[in-house]
Amino acid sequence: MGLTPAPQEGLVINPATDRPLAANDPYFLSINDKLADKGFLVTSTDELINWARTGSLMWMTFGLACCAVEMMQASMPRYDVERFGFAPRGSPRQSDVMIVAGTLTNKMAPALRKVYDQMPEPRYVISMGSCANGGGYYHYSYSVVRGCDRIVPVDIYVPGCPPSAEALLYGILLLQRKIRRTGTIER
């Protein structure tokens, strides 16, 4: 009695032969077409999880300066980021995304790291504004961290001083696209 190896993730198994199928296999394509005609959607669990995760991102504000005003404006009715499934949360333990907006000082850097460490995996960071991206106007000051990416890993950079609410909204859409493309399992 021979044991068959476990199928690799992302492969479809032919029930007749117990062998994996390629995505362009005629058997797989015919099953997919038959189910699509009946209103079913054939997808992998990874794609389903990524789709669900991008539609329900919970964000935490880390507003440090004037960029936080633009971040608040993105939540108002004109831009309404919640229609994209991007809702604010008050606790880092309930958040998937942290938006760092403003000048990060050396004194505030440990607090930023502490909040980041309290977030559950997978977690994402959006750096908003010139000061959060690289120090901005205060780059040469002794008390300013030259970019929050020196403290936490950053996924999306939103440039500007301060960036508009449209720029933040575009950064959110880029983050959702990145999650769909890369997935959350590899992270």
From Swiss-Prot:
> Which catalysed reactions does the entry list for this protein?
a quinone + NADH + 5 H(+)(in) = a quinol + NAD(+) + 4 H(+)(out)
Listed cofactors: [4Fe-4S] cluster
Q: Name one GO molecular function term.
A: NADH dehydrogenase (ubiquinone) activity
What are the UniProt keywords, alphabetically? 4Fe-4S, Cell inner membrane, Cell membrane, Iron, Iron-sulfur, Membrane, Metal-binding, NAD, Quinone, Translocase, Transport, Ubiquinone
Positions annotated to bind [4Fe-4S] cluster:
C66, C67, C131, C161
User: Which InterPro entries does the record match to this protein?
Assistant: NADH_UbQ_OxRdtase-like_20kDa, NADH_UQ_OxRdtase_20Kd_su
Where is this chain's protein located in or outside the cell? Answer: Cell inner membrane
GO terms, biological process: aerobic respiration; electron transport coupled proton transport
> How does this protein lie in the membrane?
Peripheral membrane protein
Q: Which domain of life is it from?
A: Bacteria
What Enzyme Commission number(s) apply to this enzyme?
7.1.1.-
| SUPFAM superfamilies reported for this sequence | HydA/Nqo6-like
Q: How is the cofactor bound?
A: Binds 1 [4Fe-4S] cluster.
| GO cellular component annotations of the record | plasma membrane; respiratory chain complex I
- What Pfam family is a match, any one? Oxidored_q6
Q: Which PROSITE patterns match?
A: COMPLEX1_20K
Regarding protein family, the annotation reads: Belongs to the complex I 20 kDa subunit family.
The UniProt entry, under NCBIfam families, shows:
nuoB_fam, PRK06411.1
Q: What does the UniProt record say this protein does? A: NDH-1 shuttles electrons from NADH, via FMN and iron-sulfur (Fe-S) centers, to quinones in the respiratory chain. The immediate electron acceptor for the enzyme in this species is believed to be ubiquinone. Couples the redox reaction to proton translocation (for every two electrons transferred, four hydrogen ions are translocated across the cytoplasmic membrane), and thus conserves the redox energy in a proton gradient.
Q: Which HAMAP family match?
A: NDH1_NuoB (MF_01356)
Subunit structure, interactors included: NDH-1 is composed of 14 different subunits. Subunits NuoB, C, D, E, F, and G constitute the peripheral sector of the complex.
Its protein name is NADH-quinone oxidoreductase subunit B
Q: Which organism is it from?
A: Methylocella silvestris (strain DSM 15510 / CIP 108128 / LMG 27833 / NCIMB 13906 / BL2)
